């Protein structure tokens, strides 16, 4: 115990001494330390003493070295690490001229790092710019350059005559950026327009946007040049655009003269290489080994290589190099990447990837529900004996790679389609399809040393596409031919070169409907003969072509449940002179089954909308004409209707909404008969619960007549021949008031319907609906001798109403559209109910409430016959069938503003078992 005390004291002294030394090497930077060469009269003296600079506020250094270059970097450390702590503040360097030194900061000792951490803004702008002809970039380190936990980073307009236009280090780290990290318009007279490293770069775990824009290198790596293994991973947004290199790697170059560095790009939520340019190879990336796996949207777009012998429009792999592409959690797309041959008048050729001499693919795979799209071809040089297993998973485990590898000429222009190289992809190694799908579309050719297919995978090919081998056989166990492409009248081609090489096709011959709607195509509206499959070998077709295990009847995938129905038959022919065996397919049409989208009944259901509108107009005129305070005059009212019909297993639901205005007039005769006329203009919208909607305009009119009469049963009995005692006659009422009303209405509707099919072109159709309606009603008003507090008059009512609506025939405008025959709706109903009225003549405010039970005693439901525009196939379409019993509740209120003006409102609700209808009217009347 005694001997331990001195050692404790010694350790404490040493630790305290080290702490004091650390404090001595830390310097605070405050806003007072800022420098502006345009304002400050003195000169800036480079700082070289501290190893750590900690900011206490926002600091800037603007144009130090103006007029006379600085003797060294603004900050320099020659023996230790150099660290800047932002503490949430900003640090800005602008227009620095440090002569032959790095403009902002440098750490010159091997394995000692230059680190910036914790800034709200870190900016290096033109420090130095290209006007400093001896510039050496803005940051330099013999160890690593680390940029950590920075909210916003700007590295722009910097220049170096050496490597790394902005940043040069043994390594580079960018991590923890939460805002925007921008590297733009930096340039190097050698390599690495923005960044150059000898031991690799790591750009990882940035939750903001990392962008490299318009950086230029005079040799390689327009944005980044690395000679060591580099990792770009787990970034939210990584974007390279407009970068350029005079030799290789328009955006990134990752090679070393001696050694095999690897570039690993993985799990970036968005990764885009766009419009980058190189003059030798790799418009976007040139690497010895590249492993690219998607973490989201990944795209190579419009990258270009321009030289006498350009290679790799988007990606170039060095000789004996390796490439792995894996679509893990997002698609990977190569589109419009090109090669331009200088000195040639030919248009640029499409190219996605070039594999250098004796290089190889190690992985080409896509996880389930993801795709690698090659709209530009792949080229390969030399040979490799290693088998490329497309969509290959780990041995002994469930294969997760059941996605799609797609080669397509879909995006080629008409001129580009004339160039065979734009359609041909080549692998100079054996290829095996282990899982998922390999699709060849739009005229492409895929060439490999040999080709084989494992169970559970699908090789899908368009008519006019080719699968060929240069030195091996073709073995296919599950071939699918895209039915949509059969109209080209060109066969799918399988070609095996070499006298002893075979083509073996077994299993199902699938006719694939990729879009799921091909049998809607008019190509199948009649019997057809298609060229299906052509197999070519170099010798002895009878021996080297084996289709003995191929199921002779083609299988539809998926089955054609809707569209044109028919049967497929395949016939084979053999030509020994050309060593070919060819299959033709015969389609025999048997019928047509419309899809649910084509069976949309909205056209028929617009008749129910007209039915609703004309009845609402009649109710408005009836209620408005017979109200307590309604005397002769002119009136105007708004009118709004809403009808909703729920669907069932046989018919889809729909809804109708309309609104507009009504103008009318009322007059009384000397005998107190009432005449009312009205005109309406409505705007309506009908929509089914599917894909169609209709807009319409309705013009309508109505004429209402009401005759009031009082029966006197006692006088009739006294004057009649029947002999009643006076006491018996006195038991009858002295007077019985009656009211008989008659109403006739008409309307015309102009309709314009749009149908937005999920897989067919949009179609439009226009037609008109005509409507005639009428009704007869009988009222028996009673004034209660003991009035209820809520109403004074009770009026039993009974009506007979008829509505007839006709829909004219028409055809939709598109070739995929339909024609509709004439449709009709006829409905005869008998409403029975009563009205309760509160108010007397002379009252300024009155209201009433009515309730009816409505029975539709006769109905002809709307229906029509639909016919395809391009063929005579037709089917019945039946409109909605509203319940035949309804409860109708109506109310109105009237307010006499003065002797010449009256305000009124009407409300109605009709409830049926499968529908509901609401109506609201608000208006005013000028009386005279």
Curated annotation (Swiss-Prot):
Its main location: secreted. It holds the Pfam family ChlamPMP_M. GO terms for cellular component: cell outer membrane; extracellular region. Residues 627-928 form the Autotransporter domain. Disulfide bonds: none annotated. It is found in: Secreted, Cell wall; Cell outer membrane. Transmembrane segments: none annotated. The keyword Translocase does not apply. It is a peripheral membrane protein. Keywords: Cell outer membrane, Cell wall, Membrane, Secreted, Signal, Transmembrane, Transmembrane beta strand. The keyword Kinase does not apply. Residues 1-24 form the signal peptide. Belongs to the PMP outer membrane protein family. This is Probable outer membrane protein pmp11. It comes from Chlamydia pneumoniae (Chlamydophila pneumoniae).
């Amino acid at each position: 115990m005694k001997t331990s005390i001195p050692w404790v004291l010694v350790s404490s002294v040493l630790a305290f001494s080290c702490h004091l030394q650390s404090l001595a090497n830390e310097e605070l930077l405050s806003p007072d330390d800022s420098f502006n060469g345009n304002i400050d009269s003195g000169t800036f003296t480079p700082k070289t003493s501290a190893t750590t600079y900690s900011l206490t506020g926002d600091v800037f250094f603007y144009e130090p070295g103006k007029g006379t270059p600085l003797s060294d970097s603004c900050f320099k450390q020659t023996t230790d690490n150099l660290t800047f702590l932002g503490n949430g503040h900003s640090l800005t360097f602008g227009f620095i001229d440090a002569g032959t030194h790095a403009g902002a900061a440098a750490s010159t000792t091997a394995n000692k790092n230059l680190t910036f951490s914790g800034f709200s803004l870190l900016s290096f702008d033109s420090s130095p710019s290209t006007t400093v002809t001896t510039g050496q970039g803005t940051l330099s380190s013999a160890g690593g350059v680390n940029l950590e936990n920075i909210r916003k980073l700007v590295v722009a307009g910097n220049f170096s005559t050496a490597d790394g236009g902005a940043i040069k280090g043994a390594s580079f780290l960018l991590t923890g950026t939460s805002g925007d990290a921008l590297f733009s318009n930096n340039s190097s007279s050698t390599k690495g327009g923005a960044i150059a490293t000898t031991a690799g770069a790591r750009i990882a775990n940035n939750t903001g946007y990392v962008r490299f824009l318009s950086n230029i290198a005079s040799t390689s790596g327009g944005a980044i040049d690395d000679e060591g293994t580099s990792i770009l991973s787990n970034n939210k947004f990584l974007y390279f655009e407009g970068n350029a290199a005079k030799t290789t790697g328009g955006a990134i170059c990752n090679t070393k003269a001696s050694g095999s560095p690897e570039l690993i790009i993985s799990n970036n939520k968005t990764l885009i290489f766009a419009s980058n340019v190189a003059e030798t190879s790799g418009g976007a990336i040139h690497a010895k080994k590249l492993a690219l796996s998607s973490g989201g949207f990944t795209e190579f777009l419009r990258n270009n290589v321009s030289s006498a012998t350009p290679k790799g429009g988007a990606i170039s792999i060095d000789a004996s190099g390796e490439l792995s592409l894996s679509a893990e959690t997002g698609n990977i797309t190569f589109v419009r990447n090109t090669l331009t041959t200088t000195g040639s008048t030919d248009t640029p050729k499409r190219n996605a990837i070039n594999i250098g001499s004796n290089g190889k693919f190690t992985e080409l795979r896509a996880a389930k529900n993801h795709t690698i799209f090659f709209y530009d071809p792949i080229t390969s040089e030399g040979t490799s004996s290693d088998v490329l297993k497309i969509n290959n998973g780990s041995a002994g485990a469930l294969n997760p790679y059941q996605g799609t590898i797609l080669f397509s000429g879909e995006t080629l222009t008409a001129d580009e389609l004339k160039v065979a190289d734009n359609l041909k992809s080549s692998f100079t190694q054996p290829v095996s399809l282990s899982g998922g799908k390999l699709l060849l579309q739009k005229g492409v050719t895929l060439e490999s040393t040999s080709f084989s297919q494992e169970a559970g995978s699908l090789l899908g090919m368009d008519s006019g596409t080719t699968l060929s081998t240069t030195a091996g056989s073709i073995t296919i166990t599950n071939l699918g031919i895209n039915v949509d492409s059969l109209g080209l009248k060109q066969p799918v081609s399988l070609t095996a070169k070499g006298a002893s090489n075979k083509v073996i096709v077994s299993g199902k011959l699938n006719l694939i409907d990729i879009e799921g709607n091909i049998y809607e195509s008019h190509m199948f509206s009649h019997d057809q003969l298609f060229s299906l499959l052509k197999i070519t070998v170099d010798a002895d077709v009878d021996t080297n072509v084996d289709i003995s295990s191929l199921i002779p009847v083609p299988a539809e995938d998926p089955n054609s449940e809707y569209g044109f129905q028919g049967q497929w038959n395949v016939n084979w022919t053999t030509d020994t002179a050309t060593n070919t065996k060819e299959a033709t397919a015969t389609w025999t049409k048997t019928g047509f089954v419309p899809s649910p989208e084509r069976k949309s009944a909205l056209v028929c259901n617009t008749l129910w909308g007209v039915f609703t509108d004309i009845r609402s107009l009649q109710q408005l005129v009836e209620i408005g004409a017979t109200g307590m305070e309604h005397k002769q005059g002119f009136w105007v009212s708004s009118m709004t209707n809403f009808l909703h019909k729920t669907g069932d297993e046989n018919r889809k639901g729909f809804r109708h909404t309309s609104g507009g205005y009504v103008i009318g007039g009322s007059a009384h005769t000397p005998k107190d008969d009432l005449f009312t006329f009205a005109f309406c203009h409505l705007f309506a919208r009908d929509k089914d619960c599917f894909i169609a909607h209709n807009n319409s305009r309705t013009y309508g009119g109505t004429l209402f007549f009401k005759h009031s009469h009082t029966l006197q049963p006692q006088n009739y009995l006294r004057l009649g021949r029947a002999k009643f005692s006076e006491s018996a006659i006195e038991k009858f009422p002295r007077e019985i008031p009656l009211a008989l009303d008659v109403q006739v209405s008409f309307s015309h509707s102009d309709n314009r319907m749009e149908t937005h099919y999920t897989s067919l072109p949009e179609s439009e159709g226009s037609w008109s609906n005509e409507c005639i309606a009428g009704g007869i009603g009988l009222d028996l008003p009673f004034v209660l001798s003991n009035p209820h507090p809520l109403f004074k008059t009770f009026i039993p009512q009974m009506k007979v109403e008829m509505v007839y609506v006709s829909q004219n025939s028409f055809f939709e405008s598109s070739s995929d559209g339909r024609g509709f025959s004439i449709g009709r709706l006829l409905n005869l109903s008998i409403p029975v109910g009563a009205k309760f009225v509160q108010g007397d003549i002379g009252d300024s405010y009155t209201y009433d409430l009515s309730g009816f039970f409505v029975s539709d005693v006769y109905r002809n439901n709307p229906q029509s016959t639909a016919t395809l525009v391009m063929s005579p196939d037709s089917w019945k379409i039946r409109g909605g069938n509203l319940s035949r019993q309804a409860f109708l509740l109506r109310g109105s209120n009237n307010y006499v503003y003065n002797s010449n003006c009256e305000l009124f409102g009407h409300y109605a609700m009709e409830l049926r078992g499968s529908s509901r209808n609401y109506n609201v009217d608000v208006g005013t009347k000028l009386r005279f």
